[in-house]
From Swiss-Prot:
Binding, GTP: 12-14, 25, 53, 71, 101
Cofactor(s), names only, from the UniProt record: Mg(2+)
Protein's UniProt name: Molybdenum cofactor guanylyltransferase
Family the entry assigns: Belongs to the MobA family.
Primary localisation category: cytoplasm
Localization: Cytoplasm
Binding partners and assembly: Monomer.
Species in which this protein is naturally found: Cupriavidus pinatubonensis (strain JMP 134 / LMG 1197) (Cupriavidus necator (strain JMP 134))
InterPro entries: MobA-like_NTP_Trfase, Molybde_CF_guanTrfase, Nucleotide-diphossugar_trans
Catalytic activity entry: Mo-molybdopterin + GTP + H(+) = Mo-molybdopterin guanine dinucleotide + diphosphate
Taxonomic lineage: Bacteria, Pseudomonadati, Pseudomonadota, Betaproteobacteria, Burkholderiales
Amino acid sequence: MIARDDITGLILAGGRGSRMGGTDKGLQPLRGTPMAMHTMMRLTPQTGALMINANRNLAAYESFGVPVVTDSVPDFAGPLAGMLAGLEQCQTGWMVTAPCDSPFLPADLVPRLAQAIEAEGAELAIPVTVDTDGRRQLQPVFCLMPVSMLDDLIAYLNGGGRKIETWATSHRLAEVLFDDAGAFANINTLDELRTHEAG
């Protein structure tokens, strides 16, 4: 079994926040607490260490008390660039990622992904949910991976790849079904944020 202490959680807060008017999503308050802090509080009991990937407002993220890593690939190259930055700095054998705007992520996310990797002999694990139409939805931004994937990810990015799902599905992938699709909801707009504030 992959030990909790051998897993570092990486909160992905390095994006432009373009669907939120360019604001830094991770620092937007939800019920009085920055969204990235909600995600951090969800991941803390499931991992041995935490990091945040951010490319602006670094002092604000550093005030959360965990290491902050910036993209080594320029121009906000997307979540994979954040994953790369995390893998480059990770001090444990495994890393799990979650976006900063996922304050409801499951309390058993990491142990279930780790269990699936062990059971299936997989390289990576990501959650799968089922939408209201019965379609399976991969949630690839939530990904448990070994740090040994670093060179492979560098090669994928150097080849122009930018989609997490394409990269993940090119490996032995454990897809783990979670019943609560709402737990993986991203808060992408200010309207969605207001809805969750009221909820």
